[in-house]
Amino acid sequence: MTEENDLEMLEELVNRGISLQREAKHKEAIVCFNKAISLDENMNGEADSNLLRLKNNSLMKLGRDE
C-alpha cells in the first residue's frame, strides 16, 4: 500500500467507527478503531491520541476499560 492509500483507509476506518458509535454499535466501532490504531502505529510509530480517545469512549459505553 502507498502512504496515500493508508491515509484513505485510516480515514475510512475512523469515519466508520464514529458512525457505529452514533448507532450505539460500540463493539463494531472498537473493531474499526483497533484497525485504525494499528494502521496509524505502522505509519507514524504511535497511535494518535484522538484515536485512542474514540476507542475509549466505546469501551466506557460497554463498561470496559483497556
Regions found by a protein language model. Give the residues of each.
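TPR-adjacent "capping" and linker segments in tetratricopeptide-repeat scaffold/adaptor proteins
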Residues: M1-E12
